[in-house]
């Protein structure tokens, strides 16, 4: 007799609401389920939430949800204590849904460490942001294609990313990205990756975002040519895209750039 067993699929969810009371931002309500946990270490200045995935990574068919709501005048940072690993998918893609809601005068920095795509990984990720006109958002996403420390560069994967940001009820930023198939055919081309397998996206949406354009360019300039990048600003947004052959070089450039907003990012990412 032949028996088959369905693979275990992880389901995890975090729903949290923050408030500012007496000059201090703290979680007002917190719901956790599955392998996702949110911790608030006291070693950092201000309110810092660390998202912990106790599974140690994300596999095909997993579905994780994060919903973060910040009430008026809240100031907080959300980060992760380690890189997130996306393992090979046997059939279904993993799904990750992230929702951020920023009330008036809120300041939220969402600064996860790298997402590492293993060979055969499949991930569909969606980000939805709803924010007030005078709220401030700082967001970083770093993607590493393959386990480069193991020499794994010629990988194949299926990665889909969908971003929507609404400010004051209006859609101000939308992006759809897809990376699929054997990556060496794409990212080895000089016009695209030129062999680089680590990339990052930095986005600031804030009343003072455009004013930081030249300062951010100056902070990133010393990392050329090892970390080519582009920085632009418009409509209350500041956007930077970076690439490097090494995740370590990319991280150094990001730390320099993020230092424009916070000087303790290196401690967050230890």
Curated annotation (Swiss-Prot):
The keyword Cytoplasm applies. It is found in: Cytoplasm. One of its GO terms (molecular function) is nickel cation binding. Keywords: Chaperone, Cytoplasm, Nickel insertion. InterPro entries: UreD. Pfam families: UreD. GO terms for cellular component: cytoplasm. It comes from the Bacteria. Its main location: cytoplasm. UreD, UreF and UreG form a complex that acts as a GTP-hydrolysis-dependent molecular chaperone, activating the urease apoprotein by helping to assemble the nickel containing metallocenter of UreC. The UreE protein probably delivers the nickel. Required for maturation of urease via the functional incorporation of the urease nickel metallocenter. Belongs to the UreD family. This is Urease accessory protein UreD. It comes from Beijerinckia indica subsp. indica (strain ATCC 9039 / DSM 1715 / NCIMB 8712).
């Amino acid at each position: 007799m032949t028996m088959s067993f369905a693979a275990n699929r992880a389901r995890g969810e975090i729903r949290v609401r923050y408030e500012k009371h007496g000059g201090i931002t703290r979680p007002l309500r917190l719901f956790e389920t599955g392998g996702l946990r949110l911790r608030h270490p006291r070693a950092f200045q201000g309110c810092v939430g660390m998202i912990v995935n106790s599974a140690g990574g994300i596999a095909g068919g997993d579905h994780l949800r994060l919903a973060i709501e910040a009430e008026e005048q809240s100031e907080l940072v959300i980060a992760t204590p380690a890189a997130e690993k996306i393992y090979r998918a046997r059939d279904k893609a993993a799904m990750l849904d992230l929702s951020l809601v920023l009330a008036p005068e809120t300041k939220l920095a969402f600064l996860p460490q790298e997402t590492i795509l293993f060979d055969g990984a499949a991930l569909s990720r969606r980000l939805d942001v709803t924010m007030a006109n005078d709220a401030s958002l700082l967001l970083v996403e770093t993607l590493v294609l393959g386990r480069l420390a193991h020499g794994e560069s010629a990988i194949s994967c299926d990665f889909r990313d969908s971003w929507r940001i609404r400010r004051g009820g209006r859609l101000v930023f939308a992006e759809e990205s897809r990376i699929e198939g054997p990556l060496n055919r794409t990212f080895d081309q000089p016009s695209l990756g030129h062999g680089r397998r680590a990339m990052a996206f930095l986005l600031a949406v804030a009343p003072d975002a455009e004013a930081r354009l030249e300062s951010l360019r100056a902070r990133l300039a010393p990392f050329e040519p090892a970390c080519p990048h582009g920085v632009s600003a418009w409509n209350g947004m500041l956007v930077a895209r970076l690439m490097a052959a090494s995740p370590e070089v990319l991280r150094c450039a990001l730390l320099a750039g993020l230092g424009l907003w916070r000087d303790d990012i290196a401690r967050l990412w230890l």
